[in-house]
């Protein structure tokens, strides 16, 4: 995670960003810290990346890389405003002894990649359409040595995979079908017939932008209906307020890069 010390909305690179609305910086930091504390209280180790001036979106730490079994596929951001974030993330991983692969193609880390270690022998789901170059999917497959399934995003409101699809445990997902092309919807329905299906209201509340450890599902307080759905599926929803981070187009998952070693 990376604290929102420099978080503000000073440019608009997704439909949720409104440069005319001022961010409450102290509230953003308070809410972020509550998310960090919640994850720690659930038994997880939280590493904190130092924020850098001039990079207001570094708080969305999930976008900086994607890791599987000790190997890290680095990010290359679509928009120049975020480009320098990739170097900060690379420094974290290389300094920590991870096997780091620098990308050739544009990709935005866990924003557009998700891993299911027990599904079909270990599968990566990968989104494209708005941020990540489809060629990055093949590149990630070579780096990570896992099959990568490409899914086309078609609604600009859900510009990253992690706004439209969430991993609930090692083999199960939740997703909003309307965010995907008809072909991708059919693929998801075939591969994950027991998925938790979200509706547009769930997705617009960033209810799919969640973090799950296989039992506890951490999601924002606006996603009440999504919390009810994951509870009905056998998980324990844990709600955290993240109203300020939503102003930049992100929520729980955007703020958390999961480390898989």
Where do the protein language model's features map onto the residues?
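The feature marks the mature, well-folded catalytic cores of soluble enzymes
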Residues: 1-261
């Amino acid at each position: 995670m990376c604290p929102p010390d420099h978080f503000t909305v000073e440019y608009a690179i997704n439909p949720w960003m409104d440069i005319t609305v001022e961010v409450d910086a102290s509230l953003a930091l308070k809410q972020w810290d509550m998310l960090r504390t919640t994850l720690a209280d659930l038994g997880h180790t939280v590493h904190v990346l130092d924020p850098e001036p001039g990079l207001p979106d570094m708080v969305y730490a999930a976008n900086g890389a994607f890791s599987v079994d000790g190997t890290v596929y680095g990010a290359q951001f679509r928009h120049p405003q975020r480009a320098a974030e990739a170097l900060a993330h690379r420094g974290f991983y290389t300094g920590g002894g991870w096997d780091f692969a620098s990308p050739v193609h544009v990709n935005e880390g866990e924003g557009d990649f998700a891993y299911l270690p027990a599904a079909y022998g270990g599968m990566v789901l990968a989104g494209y359409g708005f941020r990540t170059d489809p060629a990055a999917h093949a590149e990630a497959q070579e780096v990570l040595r896992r099959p990568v399934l490409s899914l086309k995003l078609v609604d600009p409101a859900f510009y990253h995979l992690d706004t439209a699809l969430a991993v609930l445990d090692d083999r199960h997902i939740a997703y909003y079908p309307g965010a995907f092309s008809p072909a991708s919807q059919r693929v998801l329905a075939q591969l994950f017939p027991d998925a938790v299906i979200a509706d547009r209201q769930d997705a617009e509340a960033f209810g799919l932008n969640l973090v799950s450890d296989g039992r506890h599902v951490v999601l924002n307080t606006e996603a009440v209906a999504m919390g009810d759905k994951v509870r009905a599926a056998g998980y324990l929803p844990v709600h955290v307020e993240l109203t300020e981070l939503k102003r930049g187009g992100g929520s729980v998952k955007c703020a958390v890069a999961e480390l898989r070693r």
